[in-house]
Amino acid sequence: MTTSRSNALGSDGGRRAAHPILRPNPRIRRLPRACCSALALAFLTVAALADGAGATFPRSDTLLSARLDDANWILPAKTYAGNRYTALTQIDKTNVGALGRAWRTDLADDGEQEASLLVWNGVMYLSTPHDGVLALDAGTGKLIWQAAYNPAYVLLFAVSRGVGLADGKVFIATQDCRVIALDAATGNSLWNVQGCWDTSNSWYSMAAYVYKNQIIVGTGGGDNGNIGLVSAFSTKDGKRLWDWQTIPGPGQPGHETWPGDSWKHGGGAVWSGVAVDQVTDTLFVAPGNPGPDFVATKRMGKNLYTNSLVALDISGARPKIKWYYQLVQNDTHDYDPAMIPVLFDGQVGGRTHPLVAIGDKAGNFVLLDRQSGKVVHRLALSRQVGIDTRPSHDGTEACPNHGGGIEWNGGAYDPNSNSFLVPSTEECASWKITSDDPQYIPGQVYSGGPFPKRQNGTGVLTSIDVDTGKLRWRNALPYPAEGGVLITASGLAFTSDVGGNIYAFDASTGHQYWKDSTGSAVVGPISAYSLNGTQYVAVVVGQAGNQQTPNLPTSEGSRVIAYRLGNAPAVVNDATGQVALAHASNGVGGLSEAPSKSTGSAPYTKQQVTQGSEVYAKECAVCHGANLQGISAPALTGPGFAHSHLNGSQLRVVVTQTMPLTAPGSLKPDEYAAVMAFLLSYDCVQPAGNGQQPFPTTDLPGLQQVELGSATCTVTK
């Protein structure tokens, strides 16, 4: 075997700087939304600390008037109502064509970027997929400080949807079920408390949501057979204030919709976000799909409160259900009501009504009276075929796919036209179950079959007349649309697609005024703010391995991009370089210095590489790509893989313990060794002993010094 080396370059054509590697995590958990484990995301990126931020911070009363403060963006969806609407008008229909990039900041964490960008007094705060937190100058993009938390375990396909702000603190809910407060001026940890009850199957990915001195967060993990949990913690010290479980236990209303003990692993995760009616102290949550995902015979019944919109009275010591509406009963296709609820007062029948909008991944869009829960309008925005047919052993076609329909960023209400704008995705798939009686195993996917592969879907932006429920206009988008909508008082609607495009449409007519190609997938929501008299529109982009859809045109890395009027060259900042570690307190998730950088070598033979390529093609290529470039799972080579900081020993643990995802540990020892040989050769690790020593079936101490992903090699067999 011979190899030729080519250096892996960063997004600007230069080699990216190295990062300290954090201490290996002994527990690695699989995330079920792809068929293979995402090796490139198995370990956190490094923390960093630079100059402090000196902005005066919002208090609870400031947050309560967030809707009136359009210079800042201090809640995940702008206001408690969850409506991404801004009164800023500097950018309008007459000049949006001159919108240009003000600045760009490149990020080290190449995971799926879904964070809401919060802005307060000239400082932008965001989280990265592996629970890093950054503070940037909102006018220039320059890094102020950067901090990261080293968790007890990490998620494969990790994601963080944002932070919360209040009282001089930045709050983040982490993948290992912690709720953490950071000093907003320095990024130092102030307190760190346990969140989820079921740490075997649960995690946090939603943005920390601050309301009345409470941090409200919901758990992910419904596909792993947990019970969804919404909790509130004190902003002062992290004290647990209340909990609400989405699956009713014995003696609770709705428990009769679960036969036997099926409720114990019923799912119902609240992973996307929530909204609050401040006048009535009503929290709106939307628990996701039941478990097991695809086998309804294990849980015959309505399966409350999964796939539902639930209105909770949180004025007392414990939440109480006011009303609920179930979008899909006894779901068998993972059709979560992922959309964050949007509250608004709209015109229906000549009168103003308090409304709430919700959407799900089946493409259902529902408008309800938010006081009574009565349905005002319900319509399907995606093509629906076979959604009531249960998955079978032979495979059952259905549209949309579990990644189609209406995703978590949802839509927004335009008060100027009394319209609701919402993006959706057209995509079909085949569901196939592998067991009629799947068994619950802690820490593993509880679905009854593999998740359908993502297809080459397309997007649609739809305008709905709130008065009549009829469609006003629809615009086709070339790629799935998951980034939500931002509407401005000047009549513009900004949206995006995972092909990397950002658009500005006329909110009333759908006419396209502007488009920019970011070079990387856009999945996170768009924010707007004003600084020194200048209006900005900003978003974080990036998605390692093009994991959401296989037909993305390019992936140029993760970055924050801010736009303003004018076409001057954008300021380019680099937040990927090596910097000092931030302080971590409370003895949880401490940081450690990296071992010395070394490419190293490892024993493997040409025969093992050949065998490994065959096993990889059969078991892994469908997700990670024939050339390890990443499809529905991230790339296993190149700069994104390098930033995962897996050394050879850690890679071996992940491969042998988590692959294949649907049947971990099912390969023979020599097959795992062969796959390791193939991966090592592809990532330029040279064979030891002139290629005569085979890769062993057990670990090697020397593999800890083998760095992966910094270069890509062409393997000649």
Region roles according to the model:
Residues D70-A71, N121-G122, D167-G168, K212-N213, ...:
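Short coil/turn segments that connect the beta-strands within blades of beta-propeller domains
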Residues T56-R101, T246, P250-G251, P450-F451:
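Blade/loop signatures of beta-propeller domains
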Residues K606-S613, G625-P660:
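Gly/Gly-Pro-rich "capping" loops immediately C-terminal to redox-active cysteine motifs
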Residues D137-T140, D183-T186, T235-D237, I314-A317, ...:
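Short loop/turn segments that connect beta-strands within beta-propeller blades
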Residues T105-S116, Q146-L165, N192-A207, N224, ...:
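Extracytoplasmic beta-rich repeat domains
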Residues G577, G589-A602, K606, S613, ...:
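Flexible coil segments in periplasmic/lumen-exposed cytochrome c-class electron-transfer proteins
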Residues G228-K239, K302-G316, G459-D465, E556-G566:
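Beta-propeller blade signature
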Residues S527-V579:
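Blade-level signature of beta-propeller repeat domains, shared across WD40, Kelch, NHL, RCC1
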